[in-house]
């Protein structure tokens, strides 16, 4: 690469000739498409901010000026321009670059990221600290129009506008226009008001007028009011200015010259600025431009066709299909998503039942409380949400769901390890935090068939809030003798075994394989699978009380998790044997393939066998 090979830091971006910048953008897009096609990741959003990222690093001095990317999934170009091009081919691979911003990876990454609508709050905090430290550097938040549907973003805008801090919020508008403007005059003024010369002239004029004895201040105030009235004739909305921001734009987000001029102008304003830019999501790759949602987060794909390498079914798709089947017979079923209809498998439901489908935007808290209203009205709401995003609505689950004794279903997708999306997306906390909420029932099916049984039980044989958690990806093979009744628990193997493996969810497949291998070596081992992990069946606990050893394996956080509760219940009932819990300790889990993470935490077949064999031949059959 002629230009990327030379860029070791943002300083090298500043040294390029202006005519070279479009060629740099072209190289970056080639690298983005090629790398994501091999590693998977977020493509459309990154293709849309190439020119913006170049302009940011050309105008500002990162990391002294702090660029904060909302969600962080669109920071690939940022990584390329901050010295990480040589390692970029490792992105989302174990031991390689993160798919999101990561401060441990680079000083140019200000925060760990992955969740939406946080950037303005973070940038306001940085800007406030700058003010307290008399630091003249700038805090910049880059947020998309999608993330602006999150309530946290509006809380931050409300506070930032009143703060008077030196803060720049860049609104990357690639789907909708926040404020519809009128005609060519508006477009001309948008460009004019973004030029540095405009702000220099404005500042000098205000300074001269304010020096006029007696009447200077009044003249300045009247001119400001007149300018505002004229602007309001041209612009329909002054929402951001009403909040206290200086509004600039909209600007062509793919014109580097205009972007640089606008950013230079924004730097000169000693007040919060909102720079509104228009971009094309997926720009430069036809398949992504035509179907940006499908290329938002994508697995490995064929560059020439745009088709994913793997296109089979998965838990999300099976959930979506089955929910459509139920909804066709039961008019009470409603589906709710927080801007994740594709990811959660609800796209088919959206098309078939548009009157009972609700995309609330990035507003998980609202989704739960909205569901409570639907439930109060006699409907059966099913809110599909990734485990990691369920964290955002804990209070609503408590106050507006469980406390109200309302019947609603939470479809907890991506439960457990999610792999390459990494530290901010691992679904390792939900079982533990749901475990502490009174009145909630939690199921954890291990196969597609069990998933369907779980939803039937949740919808027609349960009360209150019911959560059904299932992993990312495909089901794992289970023994043919697997009990399909989906009672609160099931046993694989002999009831009189000296050693029991206890687990739930997808780990059941690994547990059965481990048990079979240990039995072939002469060990007396069975598996107890918890289908309902909250409340745990007392009969399930009684089933293992006479064992010598119980090994609990859990794909989640150890503290407060299901294994801890199971251990406590056994102790209360007088268990005299040895208990071992293998789970995730008090730590966040890095990005790597799911198989690698299961191996690292001793949660796959080999890990289970090794853990059990570390105990001196306990559970081995007596030899004749």
Task: Label each residue range with its predicted role.
Residues 66, 271, 279-390, 396-406, ...:
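Non-catalytic terminal/interface segments that mediate subunit docking, oligomerization
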Residues 4, 175-319:
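Long, well-ordered, tryptophan-enriched scaffold segments
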Residues 42-163, 332-333, 337-338, 346-347:
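Cofactor-binding active-site loop characterized by glycine-rich and histidine/acidic residues
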Residues 301, 306-312, 419-421, 440-441, ...:
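Peripheral docking tails and interdomain loops at the edges
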Residues 359, 515-516, 521-544:
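Generic long, charged, amphipathic alpha-helical segments
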């Amino acid at each position: 690469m002629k230009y990327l090979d030379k860029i070791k830091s943002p300083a090298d971006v500043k040294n390029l000739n202006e005519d070279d910048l479009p060629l740099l953008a072209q190289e970056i897009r080639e690298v983005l498409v090629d790398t994501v096609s091999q590693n998977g990741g977020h493509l459309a959003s990154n293709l849309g901010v190439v020119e913006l990222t170049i302009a940011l690093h050309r105008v500002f001095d990162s990391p002294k000026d702090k660029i904060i990317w909302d969600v962080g999934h669109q920071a690939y170009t940022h990584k390329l321009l901050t010295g990480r091009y040589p390692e970029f081919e490792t992105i989302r691979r174990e031991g390689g670059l993160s798919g999101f911003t990561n401060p441990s990876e680079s000083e140019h990454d200000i925060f760990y990221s992955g969740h939406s609508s946080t950037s303005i709050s973070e940038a306001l905090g940085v800007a406030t600290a700058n003010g307290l430290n008399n630091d003249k550097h700038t805090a910049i938040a880059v947020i998309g129009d999608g993330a602006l549907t999150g309530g946290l973003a509006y809380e931050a805008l409300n506070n930032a506008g009143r703060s008077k801090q030196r803060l720049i919020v860049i609104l990357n508008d690639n789907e909708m226009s926040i404020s519809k403007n009128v005609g060519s005059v508006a477009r001309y003024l948008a460009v004019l008001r973004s030029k540095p010369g405009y702000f220099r002239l404005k500042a000098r004029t205000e300074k001269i007028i304010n020096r006029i004895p007696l009447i200077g201040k009044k003249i300045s105030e009247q001119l400001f009011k007149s300018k505002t009235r004229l602007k309001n004739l041209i612009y329909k909305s002054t929402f951001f200015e009403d909040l206290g921001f200086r509004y600039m734009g909209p600007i062509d987000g793919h014109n580097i010259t205009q972007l640089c001029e606008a950013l230079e102008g924004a730097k000169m304003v000693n007040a919060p600025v909102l720079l509104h830019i228009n971009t094309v999501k997926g720009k430069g790759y036809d398949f992504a431009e035509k179907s940006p949602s499908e290329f938002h987060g994508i697995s490995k794909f064929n560059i020439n066709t745009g088709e994913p390498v793997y296109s089979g079914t998965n838990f999300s798709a099976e959930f979506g299909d089955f929910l459509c089947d139920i909804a066709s017979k039961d008019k009470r079923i409603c589906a709710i998503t927080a801007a994740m209809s594709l990811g959660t498998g609800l796209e088919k439901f959206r098309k078939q039942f548009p009157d009972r489908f609700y995309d609330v935007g990035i507003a998980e808290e609202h989704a739960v409380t909205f569901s409570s209203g639907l439930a109060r009205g006699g409907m059966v709401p099913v809110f599909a949400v990734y485990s990691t995003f369920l964290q955002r609505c804990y209070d609503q689950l408590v106050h507006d769901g469980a406390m109200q004794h309302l019947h609603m279903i939470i479809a907890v997708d991506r439960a457990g390890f999610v792999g390459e999306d990494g530290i901010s997306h691992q679904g390792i906390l939900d079982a533990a935090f749901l475990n502490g909420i009174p009145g909630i029932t939690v199921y954890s099916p291990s196969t597609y068939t069990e998933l369907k049984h779980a939803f039937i039980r949740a919808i027609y044989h349960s009360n209150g809030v019911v959560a059904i958690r299932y992993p990312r990806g495909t089901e794992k093979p289970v023994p043919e003798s697997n009990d399909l009744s989906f009672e609160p628990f099931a046993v694989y193997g002999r009831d009189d075994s000296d050693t029991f493996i206890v687990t739930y969810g997808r780990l059941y497949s690994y547990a059965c394989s481990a048990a079979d291998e240990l039995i072939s070596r002469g060990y007396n081992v069975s598996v107890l699978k918890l289908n309902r992990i909250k409340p745990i069946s007392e009969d399930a606990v009684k089933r293992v009380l006479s064992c010598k050893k119980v090994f609990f394996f859990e794909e989640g956080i150890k503290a407060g998790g299901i294994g801890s509760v199971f251990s406590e219940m056994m102790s209360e009932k007088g268990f005299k044997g040895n208990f071992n819990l293998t789970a995730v300790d008090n730590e966040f889990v890095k990005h790597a393939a799911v198989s690698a993470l299961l191996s690292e935490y001793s949660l796959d077949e080999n890990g289970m066998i090794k853990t059990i064999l570390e105990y001196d031949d306990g559970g081995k059959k007596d030899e004749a």
